[in-house]
């Protein structure tokens, strides 16, 4: 397939992600991740040494203790290897009508299916990592049913716990189930906390509309179907594909994490397009795409994740 088709399809997907995904801000900045082939990637970690003692008695330039800067690359493998095939009516890829039809298909797929799967996986993965962190899971995973009387105190209390343990005060983001928005609206006038709704907020360069600000914490509302403690990844062979709630799944009411903690990596790979003259299966055009993705959190940043889960 010509490269310009792959570039166009990727652009369609990127635009839909930016417009509809609650987790697009989790994609790391350029240069943080490099692809090394297939499902393998490397993620950069920058570290420095701390302060030492200054020796005023030395005049040869050695009064300052030598510091070091290390930029190390750690290898990871993208665990999610997904794919899809679309069959379009008989259009020659060179016809002007083909690109219009293909764009509609790709955008609809990205907006309805791909965005939901990515959001669901990323939120669940963060919860899974926090729940598996033995050092903090007893205080960072809070069991509570959010109501008008406790919603603000529960989320604010969890944020304070996470801040103290992570030793980072600023830069946090909350993803809150949309069904709990009413609880915050009803509680907004009866609290000393500063709460506002309908804000436009930029998180890691991605702008979100209708964001709730709870003091200095941006809260993005997410459909409850994307916030589950257990998920099932469907194969697409005998079902509708995608990701759904797993057996005995509980609702995640709120997930808090630092904006630099999640590293969501994805790769639209092996895009193939077969026109009517090449396609031997039916009289039309076939578009096939392989999509690789995962989410990673450096071990030292696990303390910056917390969640409120329904009892």
Model-identified regions with their sequence ranges:
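Structured, hydrophobic secondary-structure cores that serve as assembly/anchoring elements
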Residues: 48, 72-102, 156-186
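Short helix/loop capping segments that flank catalytic or ligand/cofactor-binding pockets
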Residues: 51-54, 183-186, 296-298
């Amino acid at each position: 397939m010509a490269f310009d088709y792959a570039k166009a399809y990727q652009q369609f997907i990127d635009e839909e992600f930016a417009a509809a995904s609650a987790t697009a801000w989790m994609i790391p900045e350029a240069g943080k991740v490099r692809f090394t082939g297939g499902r393998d990637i490397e993620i950069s970690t920058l570290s420095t040494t701390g302060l030492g003692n200054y020796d005023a008695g030395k005049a040869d330039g050695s009064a300052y203790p030598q510091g070091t800067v290390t930029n190390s690359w750690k290898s990871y493998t993208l665990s999610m290897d997904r794919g899809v095939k679309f069959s379009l009516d008989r259009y020659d890829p060179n016809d002007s009508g083909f690109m219009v039809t293909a764009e509609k298909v790709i955008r609809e797929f990205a907006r309805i299916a791909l965005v939901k799967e990515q959001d669901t996986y990323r939120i669940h993965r963060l919860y899974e990592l926090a729940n598996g962190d033995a050092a903090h899971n007893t205080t960072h995973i809070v069991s509570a049913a959010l109501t008008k009387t406790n919603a603000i105190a529960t989320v604010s209390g969890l944020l304070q716990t996470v801040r103290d343990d992570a030793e980072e005060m600023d830069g946090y983001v909350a993803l809150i189930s949309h069904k709990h928005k009413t609880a915050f609206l009803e509680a907004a006038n009866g609290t000393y906390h500063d709460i506002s709704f309908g804000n436009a907020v930029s998180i890691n360069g991605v702008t979100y509309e209708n964001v709730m600000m709870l003091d200095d914490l941006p809260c993005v509302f997410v459909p409850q179907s994307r916030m589950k403690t257990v998920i099932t990844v469907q194969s697409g062979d005998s079902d509708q594909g995608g990701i759904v709630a797993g057996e005995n799944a509980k609702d995640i009411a709120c997930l808090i994490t630092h904006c630099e903690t999640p590293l969501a990596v994805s790769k639209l790979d092996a895009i193939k397009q077969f026109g009517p003259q090449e396609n031997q299966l039916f009289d039309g055009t076939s578009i096939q795409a392989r999509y690789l993705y995962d989410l990673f959190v450096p071990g030292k940043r696990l303390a910056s994740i917390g969640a409120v889960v329904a009892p």
